[in-house]
């Protein structure tokens, strides 16, 4: 997964490529994103847990990335994302609870720049979303998220068997 994030960040075009890591593991995800970014690329980390962000700050500092290349937003993703610039981000990695996936996708998609990619790890629940007998809230939310992404007319969607199922949605 990490090298995939590096590749997606490296493939982004522009002078100041911006990425977002929405995950408790922003230190690890951020390092992979930084590896693919140019020297002017920026990683925005969104996580309500201050402890996770403190760990990421020290990890990035120890790896030699200056504070000017990282932005930390200690908030719930759905509370802060609506205030971010539209069509400004080239990679958004969103590791969120499955129940939040549908709302997160609807909030994140306008932020993706043309050619940018929304990365949704573990979103396919090991293919249980294809089982119509599964009607629990988590499976229904994952199914709704998958159907919504596939309905986006301005998206190329790929599903990969990484983790419990990865969705990549790239904006046309």
What is each model feature region?
Residues 2-172:
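S-adenosylmethionine/decaboxylated-SAM
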């Amino acid at each position: 997964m990490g090298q995939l994030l590096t590749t997606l960040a490296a493939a982004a075009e522009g002078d100041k490529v911006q990425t977002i890591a929405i995950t408790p593991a922003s230190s690890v995800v951020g390092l992979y994103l930084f590896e693919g970014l140019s020297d002017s690329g920026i990683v925005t980390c969104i996580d309500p847990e201050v402890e996770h962000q403190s760990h990421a700050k020290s990890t990035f500092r120890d790896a030699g990335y200056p504070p000017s290349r990282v932005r930390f937003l200690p908030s719930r993703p759905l509370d802060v994302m609506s205030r971010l610039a539209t069509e400004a981000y080239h990679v958004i990695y969103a590791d969120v609870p499955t129940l939040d996936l549908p709302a997160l996708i609807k909030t994140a998609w306008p932020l993706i720049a043309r050619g940018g990619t929304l990365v949704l790890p573990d979103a396919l629940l090991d293919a249980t979303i294809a089982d119509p007998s599964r009607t629990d809230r988590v499976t229904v939310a994952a199914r709704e998220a998958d159907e919504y992404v596939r309905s986006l007319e301005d998206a190329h969607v790929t599903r990969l068997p990484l983790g419990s199922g990865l969705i990549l949605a790239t904006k046309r």
